[in-house]
Amino acid sequence: MQLPPALCARLAAGPGAAEPLPVERDPAAGAAPFRFVARPVRFPREHQFFEDGDVQRHLYLQDVIMQVADVPEKPRVPAFACQVAGCCQVFDALDDYEHHYHTLHGNVCSFCKRAFPSGHLLDAHILEWHDSLFQILSERQDMYQCLVEGCTEKFKTSRDRKDHMVRMHLYPADFRFDKPKKSRSPASAEAPGDSGERSEGEAMEICSEPVAASPAPAGERRIYRHRIPSTICFGQGAARGFKSNKKKTKQC
C-alpha cells in the first residue's frame, strides 16, 4: 500500500511539524457543518464539573474507613477446655482453640510427646531420634535432610545442615535448629545404680533398727516452738496429763 505524498512528507519531517494534514472530502458531500478544534479548558477545584466525582470519592473513602474501623469480632462461645488429656487450656473462641490445637497437638511425636509446628519437622524428628537404623545409614550416606519444607538437600552431619540453612535459607546463626542429645558418661550411668543400692540398704537398716538423729552442728542449735500447753504431758512415766498452775496453800 502506497502512502499519500503529504503523509510521507509529514512522517519524514518529524514531530516538529505543526501544520495539520490535509483532509480530502468528497465534493458531493458539500462543506462540513462544523469545524472542531481541540483546546484545553481549565476548571477551578470547586467547579460543578467535579461535583459527581467528589461525591463518589467521598462515599468510597467513607466505606473504606468503616471497613477498617469495624474489625469483625470472633464468635464467642461458652468457655470450654482443651479435649486433649493433660492440657488445661481454656478457650472462649473457636479460632483460638483451632490455633492452639494445630500448634501444640496437631503434630506430636508418639514416642516422646514433643509437639512440632509442621509434619515435615515431625518426620525429621522421628527419623533422627527414634529410628534405630538412622545412625547406621548416616555413616554410609547423607541422612540429615534440610528442615525447610520443599528443600531436598541432605547432609552428612547436623552441623553441615545448620551451615546450609544459615547460608542458603538466611536463618539466624543462633537459631535452635535441633535439640542435641545428652550423652551420659559412664560415671553418671553408674551413679543411679549405686545410689539405688545405697538407698535400698539404708531402707533395710531403718527397718531393722532405729537410726539416731544426727546432732546439729555447734552454733546452729535448733529452736522448736510448740503450741501444746505446758499443762499437758505425753509419754510413758510422765506426770498426770492436766496439771494445775495454782500453788497449793499450806495450812497452818
Swiss-Prot record:
Record keywords: DNA-binding, Metal-binding, Methylation, Nucleus, Repeat, Transcription, Transcription regulation, Zinc, Zinc-finger
Any one Gene Ontology molecular-function term assigned to this protein's record: zinc ion binding
InterPro entries noted in UniProt: ZNF511 (IPR039258), Znf_C2H2_sf (IPR036236), Znf_C2H2_type (IPR013087)
Spans annotated as Disordered: 177-221
GO cellular component term of the entry, any: nucleus
Subcellular location: Nucleus
Residues bearing the modification Omega-N-methylarginine: R240
Classification via PROSITE patterns: ZINC_FINGER_C2H2_1
Ranges annotated as C2H2-type zinc finger: 80-105, 107-130, 144-169
Job description of the protein: May be involved in transcriptional regulation.
Family label: Belongs to the krueppel C2H2-type zinc-finger protein family.
The protein's name in its UniProt record: Zinc finger protein 511
Species for this entry: Homo sapiens (Human)
Species lineage: Eukaryota, Metazoa, Chordata, Craniata, Vertebrata
